[in-house]
Regions:
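N-terminal accessory alpha/beta regions
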Residues: 43-110
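Lipid deacylating catalytic domains
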Residues: 1-52, 56-61, 118-189, 193-316
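Proteins enriched for Cys/Gly/acidic motifs involved in redox and nucleic-acid/cofactor modification
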Residues: 98-129
Length: 316
């Protein structure tokens, strides 16, 4: 029987993993129903990889709890202090991502921060990053400086801090191994930062379960700073054990920013194509995987038939 592995995204430290899994499965069930599928995966059918507390503790320099399987408002006056505490490498990463998101939002060209990350150091780099974050707050719908700070902190730590990457990767590797009792295939659904983790693990794995579907809604893999960090470690590839890769995106989701087209995420000649459908995410900010609405229905990527439909096909 094909199993389901779910990998969450950014900024979920301190949350109850069982409640998060229930939300994901609730939204996915709604999406499957909308797609005409009779399937309703339950906790018994899925492994939810929760690394939120592990990532938070590793980033803060403490002893991490284990990876388990089962947006804040920013005071503009606090931005210089928050940004100034970041190391130069993370500052450059933050500035690169902020500028690319601002370009994607088509902000006014006369208010572009006057410097670029390359070669900028010290106070000038802090000032440029603070200016870019202020512009994000002003011009980018659905994204705040606080959200972007958290996203870049988490993604940068995963991409550039070996101890963070090893710990989080190990949790997903264990989930992939534990999801099957033999050679059963595994469907992987990975949202936001979780898609970076899933890609990194699957692209680097040798023997392991077949993955009939890798689903990466709202992925930041197409953001240049993220893609280039991955490509600096190993060439970009279509993971060998993945049969189908679907990467849905709402064009208003500026934390995902780009469709995973060959121009944005180039793969070797002859590689299978990544399917990149455009969808409409009704969740606030257009980025959430699962979002409960007041009327008891679901929003978020997983609640959409175009997103959940491929999961139903792969699980049958």
């Amino acid at each position: 029987m094909t199993r389901l592995v779910l990998v969450h995204g950014r900024d979920l430290d301190g949350r109850d993993p069982e409640a998060l899994e229930a939300q994901w499965l609730g939204a996915l069930g709604a999406g499957l129903a909308a797609a005409g599928s009779p399937l309703r995966p339950t906790d018994d059918d899925a492994a939810f990889v929760y690394y939120g507390d592990t990532l938070e503790r590793l980033v803060d320099g403490g002893t991490p709890p284990p990876v388990t399987v089962h947006a804040l408002a920013a005071d503009p006056a606090a931005l210089p202090r928050l940004v100034g505490a970041l190391p130069d490498g993370e500052l450059r990463f933050l500035l690169d991502v902020a500028r690319e998101i601002l370009a994607g939002a088509r902000h006014r060209p006369d208010v572009v921060p006057p410097v670029v990350a390359e070669g900028v150091v010290g106070d000038a780099l802090v000032e440029a990053a603070v200016a870019a974050l202020a512009l994000v707050d002003r011009y980018v719908p659905g994204v705040s400086a606080a959200v972007l700070l958290t996203l870049t902190r988490d993604v940068y730590a995963y991409l550039h801090v070996d101890a963070v990457r090893r710990e989080i990767d190990a949790g997903l590797v264990d989930a992939l191994a534990g999801a099957t009792s033999g050679d059963e295939p595994v469907v992987v659904v990975a949202h936001s930062l979780g898609s970076v983790v899933a890609y990194s693990v699957l692209a680097g794995r040798g023997p392991g379960p077949e993955v009939p579907l890798l689903l990466t809604p709202g992925t930041p893999l197409g953001i240049r700073a993220v893609r280039d960090a991955l490509a600096s470690r190993a060439p970009l590839v279509f993971p060998a054990r993945v049969a189908r890769w679907v990467s849905p995106r709402d064009p208003r989701d500026l934390l995902a920013l780009h469709d995973l087209t060959p121009a944005v995420f180039p793969l070797p000649a002859g590689s299978p194509a990544i399917e990149a459908p455009r969808v409409t995410n009704r969740a606030p900010g257009f980025h959430a995987a699962a979002y409960p609405l007041d009327d008891g229905s679901w929003a978020g990527y997983l609640a959409l038939p175009e997103v959940a439909g491929p999961v139903g096909e792969a699980l049958t």
